Regions:
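Fungal secretory targeting signals
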Residues: 1-24
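Intrinsically disordered, flexible peripheral segments
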Residues: 18-82, 87-425
Length: 425
């Protein structure tokens, strides 16, 4: 992937940042000289994907995968169920990306927008043999295909990389783009966003894949990083909607229930929280294809090959959800109820669950099939998080159950409105 040079003072979070409140110390964090772009994994060319896979293989051979699993498990108690969740994992992912760039400086960690696969996650092309591999096989549930096929890990003890889908050969439904759009629009504070994302799509993916992904050494599964890059993308987009107030917004409590501040250190480091909060500064020398597109770079989400597996963005897809009854919009989509909304708080992208990977070199342009009319008014409810997982994460069972009820209420409201999600196939 090519790096883009950045002029001094370029605002990656948008164009209106003149009144940004910068905390003491943050003003001295230097602007990046080069910016990498993290892309959705389905949009990577064959060359880009192979470069990433090669770097991951090299990191595995040098035992870095074991190290990241070990490190995450050591600090897990303080970085989940608290304000550290988003900022710690932003720093953690960046450290992983730094390691991969030792093998290939052009590599950027892609994200997996797994929300579009929510109806039938196991059928996603991303979990296919060419990419991240699928369910575990055999008595030990070993992953045998994909970038991590036949991996043997040393942490916490010698074992194969394992997955055991939570519904046998399939995965129970995850959280939809419609739900994540609602979280982005209804989260007025950092603490709101952290809780809304951590206790929904975050947990659902870990538990859906199960195996090593359901443990605190989950970074040993390569899905972990694509999953958490997607979570970081959502955080970055939420910041970018109102950069003046959200870039350095950091509230809630830490793992000891003390008020969180931007001067807190990222767990396990000497890095203050404020140093990771503004993309394009310090060591956070990256942005996302979605943010570039929202800032006017129309080519950011469109492949340049003559034949395109992916065509984005789609104004038509983004308009579908805005046609819900006013009462539903007011309750779950306040930005749409009050106007057109910001494109970065609308996760209704034009990728289909049946989308081939761009790296598959489509012979012709891909045309997504229409959604299944038989599924109108039948959006599935996402799976709940079990009590033992919630407690392992250090979260409040009552808080999680309240968030789940909100998600179920949204699904029920959309079904009563006879809504047909474009991702129901």
């Amino acid at each position: 992937m090519k790096f883009l040079k950045i002029a001094f003072g370029l605002a990656l979070f948008g164009t209106h940042v003149n009144c940004m409140a910068v905390p003491p110390g943050a003003e001295s964090v230097p602007v990046c000289k080069q910016i990498g772009v993290r892309k959705e994994v389905r949009s990577l060319t064959a060359t880009e994907w192979q470069a990433y896979a090669n770097a991951v293989a090299a990191a595995y051979n040098d035992k870095w995968i074991d190290w990241f699993g070990f490190y995450h498990s050591v600090v897990a108690d303080t970085v989940h169920g608290s304000s550290q969740f988003l900022v710690f994992h932003r720093h953690f992912i960046n450290s992983y990306e730094d390691i991969l760039q030792r093998y290939n400086p052009a590599v950027m960690v892609p994200y997996w927008n797994m929300m579009i696969d929510f109806q039938n996650p196991a059928n996603s092309a991303v979990l296919g043999s060419k990419y991240l591999g699928g369910n575990g096989v055999g008595a030990k549930g070993c992953v045998s295909s994909g970038v991590a096929g036949a991996w043997t890990l040393a942490y916490p003890k010698n074992h194969c990389l394992g997955r055991a889908y939570n519904n046998g050969t399939t995965i129970s439904p995850w959280y939809s783009p419609e739900y994540v759009t609602s979280v982005l629009q209804r989260s007025d504070t950092y603490a709101d966003l952290r809780a809304g994302i951590e206790n929904s799509v975050h947990g659902a993916v870990h538990l859906g894949l199960n195996g090593d992904m359901s443990t605190m050494h989950s970074p040993t599964d390569p899905v972990f990083f694509l999953h958490h890059v997607n979570i970081d993308r959502l955080y970055a987009q939420w910041q970018a909607v109102k950069p003046a107030t959200r870039t350095y917004m950091y509230d809630g409590v830490d793992s000891k229930n003390a008020p969180a501040t931007v001067n807190d250190f990222i767990t396990g480091t000497s890095t203050p929280v404020y140093q990771v909060m503004r993309l394009g500064y310090g060591n956070m020398c990256y942005t996302y294809d979605t943010i570039k597109a929202a800032n006017g770079d129309a080519s950011a989400l469109v492949k340049r090959q003559p034949h395109k597996c992916i065509k984005r963005p789609s104004p038509a897809t983004q308009q579908i959800i805005k046609q819900l009854p006013p009462k539903v919009l007011a309750q779950f989509y306040p930005a749409f109820a009050n106007g057109p909304g910001h494109p970065l708080e609308n996760e209704m992208v034009a990728i289909s669950p049946l989308q081939p990977m761009a790296a598959d070199a489509c012979a012709v342009d891909f045309k997504a099939p229409p959604p299944n009319e038989n599924m109108r008014g039948k959006m599935p409810f996402p799976s709940g998080l079990p009590d033992d997982w919630i407690k392992m994460q250090g979260s409040s069972v009552a808080e999680v159950r309240a968030l789940e009820k909100s998600a179920y209420d949204m699904v029920e409201a959309l079904n009563k409105a006879n809504y047909l999600s474009p991702y129901m196939v």
